[in-house]
Structure formats: structure tokens, C-alpha cells
């Protein structure tokens, strides 16, 4: 909770400074817009979506993947899964998350939840069937690393910030085009709406690059946490196994791609919009840290 409060306070200060700067520059005289009120409006709507998504993330993940939470283990594999997650959670200093299995042939796993002490860790049936116990443990350790690092909360807050700024500056641009260029004095016209939508599309792409950059950084941190909890050799072996299965069709819903362990097939400019680094880069980072 302290992380959320500090993050919100910091970004509130940034928003206030941005509003004051625009006022001092006299931008409001060109557009006749109250930027303080606009900032508040954009912040409310910008954060609302990302925070609501965060708080219902466990429910959404279960529904979209068909994850079955293990409350009472029915097989020795489920018993091993629960014991392994409990052991890793204890070592990471977090409460035991819910543990589930989702029906997918692809080898994948994800962690989600609004709080590191109220999370969900789930693995695919395909991963359990084809990976060795050490490799499964490494994947679980990677997901526990995400939970312990508070990555889900941080990603939601960053998304809220970029949402706010995209909405804010898109509306400034739209109003500037409408008032200062098209000289419309009769309230928001077609120029305002067209310019705002255009700006939101362009700024949205730039914002996605920022969010995905953070997402890729957190994957490296989660890999490092997985190596610490399960061993560097096991973590590298798990990533190598994932690399060998990259031809298997992805069944993870798009909304959960950023939270899965698998991903990162593109390089170059396309790689800027990927939630995961290429597996080769992740493996090399682990090898470099072990030297």
C-alpha cells in the first residue's frame, strides 16, 4: 500500500508541475482551457481503468484462461506443485499465493493479483507434462519473483500515468487545433475531435513503448529472482526449453501476455512493443550474472 501511495503522490506532483508550467507559458490563453481541471479529469479516468483491472486481475485471469485453483490436491503432481510454491513463497518472504493449472498445450505460466500477499500463480497443463521438475520449479520461482517484486502493481500504476498524459496532451492538441488554428469559437468542433483522436493514437503508441520497456526490464528481474530461488542452471534450462517450444501456438489471452513467462519473438523496432525480451537475451543475461 505504501508503494501505491508514494507512486500516486509523486505523479500528482508531476501533474501539478505540468499544469503550472503550461499556465506560466500562457498556453491556456490560446485555447481558453482550464488545465488544472483537465489534469484532474484525465488522472481520474487514466488511473481508473488500470486500477480496476488490477483489483479484478485474479478473477479475470481465472475466467479467461479456465484456471482451476488447487484447494485440495487430488494427485501427487498437484501436491508437489503446492509444496513447491509454498517453499518458494516462504523463501521470497511473501504469503502463499493461490496456485492453479490452466488447460493449454503451450508451455506457459503467469502470476497476477493486486497485492503480493494476495496473488495467483498458475501454470499450463502443457508445461507440467513436458518440463522436468527442476524446470517447472524454475518457472514457478520466476513467477514468485514477479509477485515478490510487486510487478503487477507497478505496471498498473505506470499504465495509469501514461494513460493520464496521453489523454491530457491529446486534448491540449485537439483544443489548440480547434481554437488557435481553425479559429473555432463555438465550442469543440470536428477539428477538436479529429485532432484529439489522432494525437491519442500517436501518443498511445509512444506510451506503449514506455510500458513495454518496463515490462521487459521486469522480466530480467524476475529471471534473476528465479535463479536465486531455484538455481541459475535450472532457470537457464527452463528458458532454453521455452525457446525450443516457440513453434507451439500461443493460447494465452492477449490481456495476460505481459504476465506470462513465454514471449519475446521479435527484434528491432517490432521488439519495442514486445512485453518480453527475446529468450536469447534473457539466457545470456543469466549466464553473464553467473560469471
UniProtKB/Swiss-Prot annotation:
The chain crosses the membrane at residues 4-24, 36-56, 150-170, 193-213. Zn(2+) binds at residues 142, 146, 219. Pfam families: Peptidase_M48 (PF01435). Keywords: Cell inner membrane, Cell membrane, Hydrolase, Membrane, Metal-binding, Metalloprotease, Protease, Stress response, Transmembrane, Transmembrane helix, Zinc. One of its GO terms (molecular function) is metalloendopeptidase activity. The active site is at 143. Its main location: membrane. Its EC number is 3.4.24.-. It is found in: Cell inner membrane. One of its GO terms (biological process) is proteolysis. Signal peptide: none annotated. Binds 1 zinc ion per subunit. GO terms for cellular component: plasma membrane. Its cofactor is Zn(2+). Coiled coil: none annotated. Belongs to the peptidase M48B family. PANTHER family: PROTEASE HTPX. This is Protease HtpX. It comes from Pseudomonas paraeruginosa (strain DSM 24068 / PA7). The lineage of its organism: Bacteria, Pseudomonadati, Pseudomonadota, Gammaproteobacteria, Pseudomonadales.
